[in-house]
A protein has these predicted regions:
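Glycoside hydrolase catalytic-domain context in secreted enzymes
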Residues: 1-315, 319
Length: 320
């Protein structure tokens, strides 16, 4: 039995959001929408994708999550899609911010009538749909269709025979963080790194040298940002910081490490600059670990300026 459902997302035209800002509106002519943006979605449907996920953006003023033309008329009637449609994370709730509905209850009604089958984490359906059906705002036929499409997929996955097939604590303990998986992840990460330059074979730093290395920056001891955004199950306690990795790698050698944070990730506070500069002057080599907070690289975290908030001027002609 196949036990994975493919999901096509985000439906639709999420890449056309104005100014590149997530959740924003997309103003598209019918020709552009149908001939440029829709073909990949149709190809996914024809390939047998089992689910579609609604996008956050508006299309010509209507959020995808509440767009009946998109989810029912086009996807189901014209294209013949038989699977189920799920919102993006709290996608129904988000429609209130688009000012197309006044409250969460109305958002749930709009989504249900548009053809949204599953509410991802928003809690709108579970809280309001019974009341909406009693008030005649959503038909029982709509509910039946949505439920049937979800249950059919669960049946095809074998969950009717064994609904707890993957809820195995012992299996998880023996699978997650296995040494061979960690090694594969390490090798994959190493292959993804781009070394922009290595003048005079600066790297790797020899273990035989009697030198002091200054590790400076907010990413030196940081562990949560090692996982990055959308890390799923990743736990900061399981990450190895730059400081931990280097001090372990060079333990028992003549290479000495000193450290200064220098700044933080979320403000332009310069109060730690002096300490960082003083630390750099005590070292033969300076390694600066800079970057942006992981929350800034996720969805709805658009920035108008890609510069780092705090830059420490620690380089000198005598410091590589």
């Amino acid at each position: 039995v196949n036990t994975v459902l493919a999901c096509c997302k985000h439906f639709a035209a999420y890449g056309a959001a104005e100014a590149g800002r997530d959740y924003n509106t997309s103003e598209l002519s019918q020709n552009t929408l149908m001939n440029y943006y829709m073909p990949p979605y149709l190809a996914a449907k024809e390939a047998g994708v089992a689910t579609f996920m609604a996008s956050f953006n508006e299309i010509n003023g209507v959020p995808s999550t509440g767009n009946k033309w998109l989810m029912t008329d086009l996807l189901r009637k014209d294209w013949g899609f038989k699977g189920f449609v799920v919102t993006d994370y709290t996608g129904i709730n988000e429609m209130v911010a688009h000012s197309i509905v006044r409250n969460d209850k109305e958002a749930g009604e709009l989504a249900a009538n548009a053809g949204i089958d599953m509410d991802m984490t928003g809690g709108i359906y579970s809280q309001y749909l019974v009341q909406s059906v009693k008030e005649g705002k959503v038909s029982e036929e709509n509910i039946d269709r949505a439920v049937a499409s979800i249950l059919e997929m669960k049946f095809l996955l074998g969950l009717f025979d064994d609904p707890y097939r993957y809820l195995d604590n012992e299996r998880e303990k023996n699978t997650i963080m296995k040494p061979e998986f960690l090694q594969e992840a390490r090798e994959t990460s190493a292959r993804s790194i781009v070394l922009l330059k290595n003048d005079n074979n600066f790297f790797p730093i020899s273990k035989d040298k009697n030198i002091t290395v200054a590790l400076i920056g907010p990413m030196v001891k940081d562990k949560i940002n090692q996982n990055g955004e959308w890390a799923g199950r990743g736990e900061r306690e399981e990450s190895i910081s730059l400081f931990e990795g280097l001090t372990e790698k060079y333990a028992g050698t003549n290479v000495k490490f000193i450290y200064a944070e220098g700044c933080d990730l979320l403000t332009d506070d310069s109060s730690k600059f002096a300490e960082a500069i003083a630390t750099a002057r005590r070292a033969d080599i300076v390694l600066a670990a800079m970057g942006e907070d992981f929350n800034w690289s996720g969805e709805a975290a658009c920035r108008t300026d890609l510069k780092l908030l705090s830059l420490i001027h620690i380089s000198e002609p005598t410091r590589p």
